[in-house]
Every structure is written in C-alpha cells, then in structure tokens.
Amino acid sequence: MSDLFQPFQLGPITLANRVVMAPLTRSRAEAGNVPGPLTVEYYTQRATIGLIIAEATQVSATAQGYPNTPGLHTAEQVAGWRKVTDAVHAQGGKIFVQLWHVGRMPPTAYHPDGQAPVAPSAIAAKAKTFVPGQGMVDCSTPRALETAEIAGVVNDFRTAARNAIDAGFDGVEIHGAHGYLIDAFLRDGSNQRTDQYGGSIENRARFLLEVMTAVTAEIGADRVGIRLSPVSPVNDSSESNPQPLFEYVVRELEKLHPVFLHVVEGHTGGPRDNAPFDYDALRKLYSGVWMVNNGYSNTMAQEAVTSGHADLVSFGRPALCNPDLVRRLKENAPLNEPFADTGFYGGSGPHGYTDYPFLPA
C-alpha cells in the first residue's frame, strides 16, 4: 500500500516523499525581479518536502502582473534562481518552478508605458488586482492578441523553460490554471476569438497544447508538468461546459506524456464542490502522475494516496507556514497558523517569510 511518506519516482528524479509544496506567490523578488538571499533561505528551509514547486515566475517582462514577482527571462534572474536551486539540492531537496503569463489580470496602470495587458479576447476580468501606490484597482480591458503574436508567446514559455534548466531546476510546471493567459484561452467566458484559437474546444485548447509541445520538445517531457483548475472561479474564470473541455485537454496531454498533471479540485480556499465536476473521469484519461490540491488535511492526503486517488498531494498555506511540514504531518503535530500581523505578499524582511518556527529538535 502506498504511503504519503514513502519515496516516489517522478520521471528521472526520486522524491523523498509524496508531499509537494504548491507554487505560492510571495512578491519578494528584489530589483530586476531577481530572487534574493531571503528567497534562498525560504526554499532551503522547506527542502525536506518531497517536491518544491517554486512560485509562479513570469516568462517575459510583459507576462508580469504583480509587483516583485520573479522572472526567468534575464541572465540576472537565472543567476538568482541558481542560488536557490543549489541550496535546495545541497539539502537533498528537489525543486521545479512554475512558469507563468498573467494574461488579462494586470491593470494598464501597472505597466510603466501604459500598455494594455494581453488576452485571448478584449474582455476585462471582473476582479481587482494590486497596484503599488494605488491599492486594489479594477482589472483593465485587455488587448486581444493578434494571431501572428501567439507564436512569440509560445516561444517565451519555451525559452523560460530552457532558462529554468540552466538555473538548476529539476523541471517546470506550466501554469494553466486560475484565469491566467493559458486558462483564459481555454474558457468560453474569456475567449471569444473567431480564428484557430477560438470557438470549438479543440481551438480553445490549441494555445495550451502548443505551449506544452514547445516546452516538452525543449527540455523533455519528463521534466514538464502542468497545473489545471477545471472549476475554480478565481480571477473571474468562467466556462459554460467544463467537463468536456477538460476531458479533451487531458486526453491530448496524455499524448505528450508530461511528468505530472497538477489538478486543483474546486475553488482554492473555498468549497471543494463549488461547481459539479467529475475528477475521477479525468483521472481515468491520464496514465501518468496525478497530483491533487485544494485544502487537503493530513488525513485526506493520506487517504488520497493510499486509495490511489492521487500519487502526490500539494499543500499551499501549510507549506508556507511550516518549513518542517513533512515532519509535522508524519508526527501528526500541530501546524503553525499564518502570522496575524503580516500578509502573504510583499515585505522586505524575514517576518512572515523565513521566521515561521520549526518543531523543537
């Protein structure tokens, strides 16, 4: 019988256990969107987690939508991340990075040149986002990408994946979830194109599959995973018929043999069943490693693995607040709660970032 704390073979790498740190935006990058010394410490503290998926990292300057999020499109960023991966590996850990294009989420005011964000269609998200000096503001109406521009965005993902390997990461996770660019192309609530990237399910999935094809060709399918969120409403994500859409996506991904599928089962931080969806039907369409996420407790995670529902279970806030998460889960010890006097995003010092306590030795 499988156990959450047993080693697991993920493509060419062996994980010490089946616990995964989900990608968690912290907005802690330094000048030039380069990871700094505190980021090195933050991830190294969590190296006992079977697999770390480092925070969403933009694939280009125009892919950014929030302050102080790291990139993987300059030599300085690659060098900064190399310090992180070297430190994690020195502690015996394994680390992927999530590659990200925010799409329509940033307001025009966020960009110094006033450039509109890009999206599949010129449909603003009914959501708010943070702009330094202004607080929470409405998302702007994006500009629809021209058909001829899309190949360039695909290439940005390919280049960032190569940069990730050069930075020492064990692999990458493509961010295909939560209303960002790839997810926005998938959904009829945000994609009303009339070219080969819109309309039918096959057309709306084309961009995602082109990104996955390019990235797997560049660095190998055994180093590429993808995250999907079929029914999460975050960032005004909407789709009239998600079941056939995501069944098609998973069938096509099966042909590309990614090293894992990372599925958010519901609305993160909210009800797990916020919309009806048959996740077991998806699972049956994919023969590879199945990773699950969405508020799993210790007991739920154990049951998911022992029952065969999942191969790996990712944790968000528990990994953020508990650098020794695996030990706490194994010993059924209490988990740290988020500090009440600090948020999850931003900051310049260790508080709320690298000062969460470990269990006593």
Model-found features: residue ranges?
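Flavin-dependent oxidoreductase catalytic cores
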Residues: 1-361
